[in-house]
Amino acid sequence: IAEAEDAVKIQFWKAEFIAVNYDVTWCIEECRRYGTLNSYMVFLYAAYHDKKISTEELYQYLDEIDKLKLCESNGQFQYYLKMLLQPLQDAYINDPSKCIRIATIEIEFCFCLEWNNMKCFKIEINRNPKFLSDLIAIVFRKDHMESVEQDDSEKNRISNLYRLYHKIGFCPTEKGGVIKEDDLEAWIQQFRKFLKENDQSSLFGMVVGRLFAFSPVGDDGHRPCEAVRNMIEKYADKSMQSEYAVTIFNRRGVHSPTAGSAEKKIAQGFQDNADYLALNGYPKTAEIYYSLARTYNSESTREREEAENGRF
């Protein structure tokens, strides 16, 4: 195959095989040059799995993947991508420059990764909120700019990044279930500054409200944690409160009908949480949970009536 014409090499190297029986460096370079991203990932996985390349070499080879063409995002490609990212994330998550590069790869292929597979992207958002503000600048319109025409490629890119935005599921500066208030406020102030620079200040409440909905529980056993409560009381507007509530509501996902009994129980839990927050000096945060209680009480009534009318 080394002496074959380019057309033959292209056909050979686009095949997704995993045997690594020859000079590994030569094979990888040939696959990168003539193959597809799909075949390249399969070959890299085989080489790494067979311990024929090191983690550092794997990093160098993956640094080239944006030069290759993806045939299609199938389940096999997603599997090999996750398996190759994992050792790199483990090895370089504390190496700032390499972590950033791995994060950009995670972003590039966000359409086939779940949030928990995007470890470096999460770390980089925690380190620097500009990572998130740059994403916001792409997927949302500026406050004082008319919409512009986009070609299909750009529309597809924005669509993928919009889905990435909705995959993000963490509260800023959280480490091991703990959030330090000073760290959180510093992050918030930086993020707000970057939004202002991007002419997107109006999005502050919506974006931060969504992130706050992923807060860990507080030391007192109530949600959100104390640091997030204090930030809500200090910075919240209606958009922040609304987006927090909507995010909590949407996280329930698909569920089986119970004629309203499950919704009634959920509503009571939110009501109890809200009452506690209100009694302890968190009125804005309490209102979020009161609104959730009202929503679930309405859902409970609707489902009970549908059950009584034989719609289940």
Where in the sequence are the language-model features?
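Short helix-adjacent coil turns
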Residues: 22, 274, 280-284, 288
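Alpha-helical junction/boundary sensor with strong preference for TPR arrays
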Residues: 235, 239, 277-278, 296-297, ...
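Non-catalytic all-alpha helical scaffold/repeat segments
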Residues: 1-249
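Structural register within alpha-helical repeat arrays
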Residues: 14, 207-211, 266, 273, ...
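Short, charge-rich amphipathic alpha-helical segments embedded
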Residues: 284-310
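Short amphipathic alpha-helical heptad-repeat segments
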Residues: 259-271
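Inter-repeat boundary and helix-capping residues of tandem alpha-helical solenoids
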Residues: 256, 263-264, 282-283
